[in-house]
Amino acid sequence: MMILTKTGPLGPVTNSFIIATTRRGQIRLYNILQDTTIPEPKRKHIPSSGTYPKGFRVSGTHVGVKAANTKYPDLALISSDEPCTAAAVFTTNKFQAAPVQISKLTLDQRKGKGIQSVVINSGCANAVTGKGGLEDAQSMASKVDECNGISEPSTLVMSTGVIGQRLPISKILDKIPTAYSNLANTHNAWLATARAICTTDTFPKLISQTFTLPSSPGITYSLAGMTKGAGMIHPNMATLLGVLCTDAPVDASAMKPLLLQAVSRSFNSISIDGDTSTNDTIAFLANGAAGGQPVTSSSADYTALQKVLTSFAQSLSQLVVRDGEGATKFVTVRIQNSPCYESARRIASTIARSPLVKTALYGRDANWGRILCAVGYADGVTEGTVIPERTSVSFKPVDGSPVLRLLVNGEPEVVDEERASAILQDEDLEIIVDLGGGSKGEKGLGGEEAVYWFCDFSHEYVTINGDYRT
């Protein structure tokens, strides 16, 4: 038995926000004290309450990592009252940022145990900064350990922002004790922390939920997560950071497999612009504060928690796509009836990062030929996966009306352009590519499915990224 109660988008927020932008709108920050709101289309994604895990406290504090930021929070601290088991997934970019290297080393040294905090700064990536950058990242972690009264390494560190610049490390170290003294387990504290890790994001991304596990049906566990990212998103991984926290007890040996599976079907299945960053990190911490039996890889609880964590990570990662720089559409691409999952995933990824597909969607043009072209040139696809005369393409409207068939078994349909245009007016769209089982279709085989989430390309994306550093 497994019960889920999710607290996610709950309509207009109780508190107010202001979006402060630079000359051309690329830096978006938040001030909860101002009597304004975030943009109407984004407001629905901000939770007005949450159910947060026991034993975790968080804070968002202003440092001024970027000189132009004179009052907005840009230092996030997540801390557990008790040591956690932990795991993390990192960028595959060869130029791994200093905080990535330090966090990897800490997890290796501690063997996924004894992790107590995560410290994150926005405004500077501390990437490609040499030995000095490594020392800066280590000093951030060590300062938090000092606040915790711990001599062994127990803090993971993350950074996000412009590559190739050193951190104003003295300013950050001076404010870490303030961040520590501000730790709390309230909704406003979690929201402020989620805001503190934002860069070009238009809204903070935070969700939480409760769940139960088969071995302890009488215990209600909580899971909370925050993430940031709006550009340079095409995992494995992209410019996104994320922290997932639960008060369920999870054995250290189970943490990495749980996270890897969840990330493969969520954060590694999204794309905004096809670029892979130097800093990506998704960390998962479990402190066991709610009690119960530890989840191990051989227990029934493992399967139950895997379902919870994967679904949760999908919901969180989709907020990144919805906040894609300049995005006007949230697109789901579903590859059905493939002979193998990995080939389906590669095809979905190719469609998701195609500039021609993305610009056609922005222009509300039902140019299915661009989708089919991407299917045909997808790299690394197993022979016999794509058989042209078995391939079909459709648009699935969000209103529940019948799908609009564009291509059926390799034959083009007469498309109702008026209906196609109406479907493309909506913010949400699903593209279905049915491979008909590929070469295995005649045998009734080939039922694998892969899903990717992505957004369109607009004029604003070029504006934001053409002026990022100014």
From Swiss-Prot:
It is found in: Mitochondrion matrix. Pathway: Amino-acid biosynthesis; L-arginine biosynthesis; L-ornithine and N-acetyl-L-glutamate from L-glutamate and N(2)-acetyl-L-ornithine (cyclic): step 1/1; Amino-acid biosynthesis; L-arginine biosynthesis; N(2)-acetyl-L-ornithine from L-glutamate: step 1/4. The record marks 238-239 as: Cleavage. NCBIfam families: ArgJ, PRK05388.1. The alpha and beta chains are autoproteolytically processed from a single precursor protein within the mitochondrion. Substrate binds at residues 199, 228, 239, 325, 465, 470. SUPFAM superfamilies: DmpA/ArgJ-like. This is Arginine biosynthesis bifunctional protein ArgJ, mitochondrial. It comes from the Eukaryota. Heterodimer of an alpha and a beta chain. It comes from Talaromyces stipitatus (strain ATCC 10500 / CBS 375.48 / QM 6759 / NRRL 1006) (Penicillium stipitatum). HAMAP family: ArgJ (MF_01106). The record marks 160-161 as: Involved in the stabilization of negative charge on the oxyanion by the formation of the oxyanion hole. InterPro entries: Arg_biosynth_ArgJ, ArgJ-like_dom_sf, ArgJ_beta_C. This protein may be expected to contain an N-terminal transit peptide but none has been predicted. Pfam families: ArgJ (PF01960). One of its GO terms (molecular function) is L-glutamate N-acetyltransferase activity.
